[in-house]
Every structure is written in C-alpha cells, then in structure tokens.
A protein has these predicted regions:
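Non-catalytic substrate-recognition and accessory regions of acyl/acetyltransferase enzymes
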Residues: 1-109, 113-176
Length: 176
C-alpha cells in the first residue's frame, strides 16, 4: 500500500497491507464519521472473529486506519436478482461484505476501494473451495451505495434499494 500523502502522521506511519485483525491493533482512535461503524470495530470485531466474521485492517503502525468485514451467508432465492438465482437452490450461498470503513484522516485517497478489492480477492479464493453464488452488500446509506456501484458491477435488487449483489463469476473473472 502506498503512503497517504499530505497527512500529518507520526514517523513510521507507512500503511500496512491488509492483515487479519488481531488483539495488538489499536482501535480506540479510529473515526470514520459513522458512530455505529466505529463502535462495531471497537466492541464487536474481535469477538466475532471466532465464529461469525473475519475483519481485515490496514494500519499506520499499529493504529487501524481502515477495515473490511466479510462473512458467509445465504439469501432466499426470491430475494436475489435473476442472474444470481438462475438454477439456484432455495437458499443461495453468498459471501457478505458486512462493514467497510476508512478513518476520516485517510479518506479520499482510494483506501476504501483498495479494501473492497482486497475483500473481493479473498472471496474469489474462497469460492474455489466452497460454493457461493454472489457477494452481498447491504449499503448503509446512499453514499455507501454509490461507492459500491462505482467500484464494481454490483446489481441493485430490488431496483432502487441498497441491497447489492455481485455475481461470483464477475468476482472470479476480475480477482481470481
């Protein structure tokens, strides 16, 4: 990862490549501007590592400056767009990008898109070992929805909703 320019950061603030969240990472100063995302990182991310999700972080030193959370899930066939539900069982396996956030001090430099790309690479690798039909995102707000639609060929379903699907074939074609 490239160093973020024009930011007053302490010496040694070169950004790490995305790594799995660990107890030694500093979470207390993280502020993406969304209290719910800040609180989830501080209170839930490490607890969820054992069974429910995986969180990957980029750090300046030990301080987390961006994170993405991925997990497995399923959607009902009727709740998926045609391209995803075609020939699918009643419960369609998906990978979920549950949360993605960048500290405000590092925003606007492409780090969010980098985190999404890293998550999609990991999902592409996992799809070679386990079945899944798509990546699912429930965008938190319209700005988040625009971000995901800019970054990849997500499908809105139902139309004009914040529920987004990215067919696994697209993920594998780009990141596999």
């Amino acid at each position: 990862m490239a160093k973020i320019d024009n930011r007053p950061e302490p010496p040694g603030s070169e950004l790490s490549a995305p790594v799995a969240l660990a107890a030694e990472h500093e979470l207390s100063d993280f502020d993406c501007g969304e209290p719910a995302l800040n609180e989830w990182l501080r209170s839930c991310a490490l607890k969820n590592e054992s069974r429910f999700s995986r969180t990957y972080v980029v750090c300046a030193g030990r301080r987390v400056v961006a994170y993405v959370c991925i997990s497995a899930g399923a959607v009902e066939r009727a709740a998926a767009p045609g391209k995803v539900r075609r020939n699918a069982p009643d419960a369609i396996p998906v990978s979920i990008v549950g949360r993605l956030a960048v500290d405000r001090r590092f925003a606007g430099k492409g780090l969010g898109a980098d985190m999404l790309a890293d998550a999609l690479r990991r999902i592409a690798v996992a799809s070679q070992s386990i079945g899944m039909a798509a990546v699912l995102v429930h965008a938190k707000n319209d700005a988040a929805k625009r971000f995901y639609l800019r970054c990849a060929e997500f499908l809105e379903y139902p139309n004009n909703s914040r529920t987004l699907f990215l067919p696994i074939e697209t993920v594998v074609a780009v990141f596999g």
